[in-house]
Amino acid sequence: MVSIELDYKKPPFWIRLLGTPAITWQSQPFTLARRQARALLYRLADDLHPAPRDRLIFLLWPDIPETTARRNLIRLLSYARQALPQPELLLSDNTAVALNPDLVGSDTAQFARLCAADDAIGWETAVSLYRGRFLNGFTLPGSPEFDYWLSQTQRQYERAYLAVLRKLATAKADMGDYP
């Protein structure tokens, strides 16, 4: 069995996406005024993998010319770097954008890691992280592609949550640990 590190140290910039979204910097609430900047951070924080610029452009501005959308992304990244407590939280090059994995963490990335564990303690921790529907209450008006991504991702996490609950229930039953 693979054991999961339970004394996981949260990075200084933490993004909660399961349930009502929330961002903290050094355990203090942090807000970004622009909804589109929050949408960008939420998308990047989902799995903490670099996202191709082309996909982000299509996600945030599907109905405008590509050159205009590229300029919009450049401006949005500039705004985000200025608004974030440290500009190095956001990494980008000519092809992709990412959050700095050394400084940024998310409940969804931790949830996925724990769901893949092979022990009941990891599964219990995963269940405790699931505080509700992915990005519950968050929308990005005027971006049907973001809405589509959001609904697909919500279903993905709901399925993962139900699967980890089944694994945990089976493990508890096998150990005779049930009410």
Where are these regions (language model features)?
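Intrinsically disordered, low-complexity protein-interaction/activation regions
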Residues: 1-179
